[in-house]
Amino acid sequence: MHIDHAHVHGHRIRYAVRAGDTSRPPLLLLNGLGANIELALPFIDALDAPSVITYDVPGVGGSPTPPSPYRPSNIARLTAELLDHLGFEEADVLGVSWGGAIAQQFAFQHSSRCRRLVLAATSPGALMVPAQLPVLLKMLTPRRYVDREHALKVAGDVYGGVFRRKPAAVMHAFDHVRFSSRGGYYMQLAAAFGWTSLPWLWTLSQPTLIMAGADDPLVPIVNAYVMQWLIPDARIEILDCGHLFLVTRAEESARIVESFLTESAESGLRRGRRAASRVPSSPLRRMS
């Protein structure tokens, strides 16, 4: 995997490219809160064919903390400019957790550049069914990334799945953590504040795969079903795992994603036509 830096949208961004099948669009991976490139390596390594692009958000990993806050729309634009820098017109986009918000924003804001969309362990943002308050409070600090004892203590409560039974497994999952700064972490939190995709999810035209963990304390599974109902051409896959299934179930997750990315356009179109009847008009109009 090639790692380098680029100046895009006013930021110096650390990015990575894993070479793969050049006959298809690359998979653009948008990571979660405080998560640097290397945290996604188990999933990237499990993928067989596609080229993969991922990067550290400003203030995370090897990307310097910016002097001022940003919004998801800014990061979506940064993402588009990174694709320009790398010479790609379009990509399949996978967003996990916080990165799922950016993936939704990118698919909406730059729809012609997003061929297929994968939303993993994520939600529509502020207008979601939230986690329980103790879980949310644990996420307000990046302490789990820098304090191993604290990570062991909170892993099961925050991430669920295997970490409830084996908290020490979080040490393996966090082997590649490259924590940058508290400022960068809090900027990510601030970017998500007040953001929601709920009013426009029904406009997304991309075939969409929604993946959720059955035991995800951070993003309750009902949010996946809400997104499936609102996005016209969406399917859902539930994994018997917690929030970090892309890491803890990397092989299984990779098979599901690759199957979705390589299915025929005809089958996706047929499914889209069937699904479109579920959302005939804006959900805001239906609520009025």
Residue ranges of predicted features:
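Active-site loop/oxyanion-hole signature of alpha/beta-hydrolase fold enzymes
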Residues: T54-L94
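Flexible "cap/lid" loop of the alpha/beta hydrolase fold
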Residues: Q104, F108, C114-R144
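Catalytic histidine-centered segment of alpha/beta-hydrolase-like enzymes
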Residues: C241-A254
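Conserved alpha/beta-hydrolase catalytic His-Asp/Glu region
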Residues: M128-P130, R148-W200
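Gly/Ala-rich beta-loop-alpha elbow adjacent to hydrolase catalytic centers
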Residues: G95, G99, A103
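Conserved HGGG/HGGXW glycine-rich cap/lid loop of the alpha/beta-hydrolase fold
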Residues: H11-P64
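Conserved alpha/beta-hydrolase "acid-adjacent" motif
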Residues: P217-N223
